[in-house]
Amino acid sequence: MGEEARQWVAVTVLVFRRDRMLSMCRAASGAAGPGLWEAVSGRVQSGEDPIAAARREVTEETGLTVSVQARPVTAYAASRRGEPMTVIVFRAEHEEGEVVLSEEHDAYRWCVLAELSELGVPEQLVEAARDAWPSG
């Protein structure tokens, strides 16, 4: 019997507070992308709903309470460490709390759209943020 290739599902959460989006810098001591500025992200656990995963990841990585929009901003195929995955990008609105970083990140910023590219946030994420940015 052959072994099936695993297809992971991950979520990325664009957390907004008014007209700014949360961006976090990966820990310099971490194995995965040290120094990379990104949004909240993580794998969906087996049997877990992607929206529940999005809420869980935000709480684990930031300590914030958010409301996650049910309709994803986008989804795309990616790979990490050679493993294929589907990434579902959600938009969330900050409800309460102050950011308390987990060991995964060294710093955070509430950014305006132009700052994302300046920080070196991956272009695919900048495009998703542009689509999700609050109007007005």
Describe each model-derived feature in a short phrase.
Residues 19, 75-98, 109:
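Active-site-adjacent beta-strand/loop module that shapes the phosphate/pyrophosphate-binding cleft
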Residues 1-22, 43, 74-75, 93:
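Conserved N-terminal beta-strand and adjoining loop/helix that marks the start
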Residues 3-7, 33-36, 80-86, 102-105:
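A generic structural micro-feature
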Residues 5, 13-14, 29, 80, ...:
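Short secondary-structure boundary/capping segments
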Residues 65-74:
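A short coil-to-beta-strand element that immediately follows conserved catalytic motifs
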Residues 20-60:
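Conserved Nudix-box catalytic region and its N-terminal flanking loop in Nudix hydrolases
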Residues 91, 100-133:
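NUDIX/MutT-family hydrolases
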